[in-house]
């Protein structure tokens, strides 16, 4: 009986800590961006629309432009490539 009470106590403590840490919350992104847990390490920008990363092919979590748009580094927003300055 004591063993089961201890297991229940551990589960309650872990669940409480996880809910307080907000690990299940998906970050809110700016307009025209979507959150990805594994986005491109070198996303396309107006300045470099077809980046050739010499890095190891890794990904990073964050907010990225939705498909079809690229980042305008001067304005910090995602726009159609045809609108790049």
UniProtKB/Swiss-Prot annotation:
Spans traversing the lipid bilayer: none
Keyword Plastid carried by entry: no
Tissues of expression: Expressed by the venom gland.
Source taxon at top rank: Eukaryota
Record-linked SUPFAM superfamilies: Serine protease inhibitors
Main location: secreted
Compartment(s): Secreted
InterPro entries: Ser_inhib-like_sf, TIL_dom
Cysteines paired by S-S bonds: 29-63, 38-59, 42-53, 46-84, 65-78
A Pfam cross-reference name: TIL
Primary role: May be a phenoloxidase inhibitor that stabilizes or inhibits venom phenoloxidase while it is stored in the venom sac.
Entry protein name: Cysteine-rich venom protein 1
């Amino acid at each position: 009986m004591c063993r089961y009470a201890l297991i229940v106590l551990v589960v309650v403590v872990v669940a409480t800590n996880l809910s307080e840490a907000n690990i299940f919350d998906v970050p809110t992104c700016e307009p025209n961006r979507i959150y990805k847990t594994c986005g491109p390490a070198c996303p396309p920008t107006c300045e470099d629309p077809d980046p050739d990363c010499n890095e190891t092919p890794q990904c990073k979590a964050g907010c990225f432009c939705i498909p079809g748009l690229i980042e305008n580094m001067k304005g910090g927003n995602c726009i159609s490539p045809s609108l790049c300055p």
